[in-house]
Amino acid sequence: MSLFNVFRKEIEWGGRKLVLETGRIARQADGAVMASLGDTTVLCTAVGAKTKSKFDFFPLTVNYQEKTFAAGKIPGGFFKREGRPSEKETLVSRLIDRPIRPLFVHGYKNETQLVCTVLCHDLENNPDIVAIVGASAALTLSGLPFLGPIGAARVGLIDGAFVLNPTRDQMADSVLDLVVAGTREGVLMVESEAHELSEQQMLDAVMFGHEGYQPVIDAIIALAEQCAREPRAIEPPAPEAEAVAAKVREVGEAGLRDAYKEADKMVRHDKVDAVRDAVTAAFAGDDAALALAGAAFKDLEKDIVRGSILDTGLRIDGRDTKTVRPIEIYPGILPRAHGSALFTRGETQALVTTTLGTGQDEQIIDALEGEYRENFMLHYNFPPYSVGEAGRMGSPGRREIGHGKLAWRAIHPMMPAKDAFPYTVRVVSEITESNGSSSMATVCGTSLALMDAGVPLKNAVAGIAMGLIKEDERFAVLSDILGDEDHLGDMDFKVAGTANGITSLQMDIKITSITKEIMNVALNQAKDGRIHILGEMTKALGNARSDVSDFAPRITTIKVPPQKVREVIGSGGKVIREITEVTGTKIDIEDDGTIKIASADAEATQRAVDWIKGIVAEPEIGVVYTGKVVKIMDFGAFVNFLGTRDGLVHISELSQDRVKKVGDVVNVGDQVKVKCVGFDDRGKIKLSMKQVDQVTGADLSTQAPAEE
């Protein structure tokens, strides 16, 4: 008799086999599913604590991890084991979290953890989609109060046609990389990068993905019908909850309504805090009621703000639903930075800098798919002072990594090709003030800072964050949302792009799903806002600077025959090290013979260019060269010239006068001018000093004899 009671569901999905299996591995987890697409396999587990946590929020943790053995590799580094999460692992963890979090039953606060481990990667099917599907299945089987399942799919656009779950090779030809996840009824999450696609194309792609993942939802339901655990009993609301909510409304409603008429964020928050203190004081001595009052206070805030917007069409700061906050822009604000811009929109501000480097500055990324280099980096920082708080400063958190990647996706399609602009580019966005949509301020500031640095973007890029308030059939889509509107609303919908189309779309829904109609309204309203912001950006800086900063390295590219690369590098890198040390330049050499020389000093660059050209040049008969005596023999002197080449100046070619001893004319280390006069039968170079004026370098053999 087998130890395992295995249940398995297998479907054909997008031309490949999707397999969901449970009962064999991780049987002590509440839910465990081995999900496979092709030969890419991810183990997804879900565990929920049996008791309610002490937190007033839902403590859900999602950990996505890639094991190097999945691709037949051993980790690098001294310890030879996996360490802290990579950027991709962090991003995929967020990708799984976002569509799952809103589907847990309201009020469920038990600590819950999802772990998705990549066990096998066929280097064809991306494991992120497999992980989302597996996580959804594990939760559906677990008995936890999860209102799923959800499905997920990747959508590509190749030769004008949408492709469901394109392979890695197919993605190289796609102008769209879109991940969509949601329920049978609607979409919960979108993450994408696009090459200036229209609003209609993006909407069609989302709906194509929504339709594409329906078979996955059916498969998970079919599996759950066979083996799902009994649903956990949910703790009912406390009997006194209604009475507490009524008292919170009685004490706090008037003060909150007054507070949310205040346009200034800091003043508004002070007023809200004062009302919260009054509510807390009203429950002094009743710890049980006080524990319920916090949630009731948040519900009251939501009712007031949301109701006001739906009833009046006016928002917290007095704007209507479509107006963008005032914008002020200062390009080139930091004189020594290679490029910079200060972008301020209302109470949200980003100080963005661009730094230009060489190929040696590229980021080397060791992924399961193999090592590759990235020459465009964008880093987003959110210090606590940006929201008027004192807090921990340290390495970037998941949110900072996610916001930076969103801005990177928005800008990346507009970056120039590497052969047209051979720099490594690093952008840093410091959020110095924040009241909503700081990631979109980063997009705008990045576009401006890149143009200020002389980076020839194909088109300027702007971004805008949209929000949603929905009650039954009534809804309002909000342009350029505030932080409070994001917190109290139902949707975070970020759109970035150019005047020609969308380059990035990110959507997160806090309710069970939204309709195609709402997405269509949001996309078109976002376009109007984006065009307005681009107009403001154009007023400040219409085009990229014609040249890079005086403080940035100048990169000169030359081409040498591939077979000459070894000569330029030299034995053990000796030659190239000498060139860089003597000239003070940075030099990158590629196998195809492309050499990039970088320096802020034009003269240093030219010296390095001349040096390299000298190394790869072939000696020509009749041409005069400058060289150095490297060895003396009885029959002549060996002179090094053209980098690594040596030639012999025979004793008879040292001087017009008769020479008895070579050392009478030259010594080792002397700089001399020599003329190539031919090659011997073994191909060795024959040189002459007597045919060259050692002062001027003139070729004496071409001058007419003096008249007597």
UniProtKB/Swiss-Prot annotation:
Catalytic activity: RNA(n+1) + phosphate = RNA(n) + a ribonucleoside 5'-diphosphate
Cofactors (names): Mg(2+)
Tagged with keyword ATP-binding: no
EC number(s) per entry: 2.7.7.8
Domain KH: residue ranges: 553-612
CDD domains: KH-I_PNPase, RNase_PH_PNPase_1, RNase_PH_PNPase_2, S1_PNPase
Residues binding Mg(2+): 486, 492
Main location per the UniProt record: cytoplasm
Every S1 motif domain range: 622-690
Superkingdom assignment: Bacteria
Keyword Nucleotide-binding: no
One GO BP annotation of this record: RNA processing
Enzyme class: transferase
UniProt entry keywords in alphabetical sequence: Cytoplasm, Magnesium, Metal-binding, Nucleotidyltransferase, RNA-binding, Transferase
Pfam families, per the entry: KH_1 (PF00013), PNPase (PF03726), RNase_PH (PF01138), RNase_PH_C (PF03725), S1 (PF00575)
One term of GO molecular function: 3'-5'-RNA exonuclease activity
GO cellular component, one term: cytosol
Subcellular localization, as worded in the UniProt entry: Cytoplasm
PANTHER family the record matches: POLYRIBONUCLEOTIDE NUCLEOTIDYLTRANSFERASE (PTHR11252), POLYRIBONUCLEOTIDE NUCLEOTIDYLTRANSFERASE 1, MITOCHONDRIAL (PTHR11252:SF0)
Known function: Involved in mRNA degradation. Catalyzes the phosphorolysis of single-stranded polyribonucleotides processively in the 3'- to 5'-direction.
Family per similarity comment: Belongs to the polyribonucleotide nucleotidyltransferase family.
Name under which the protein is recorded: Polyribonucleotide nucleotidyltransferase
Species annotation: Rhodospirillum rubrum (strain ATCC 11170 / ATH 1.1.1 / DSM 467 / LMG 4362 / NCIMB 8255 / S1)
Gene coding for it: pnp
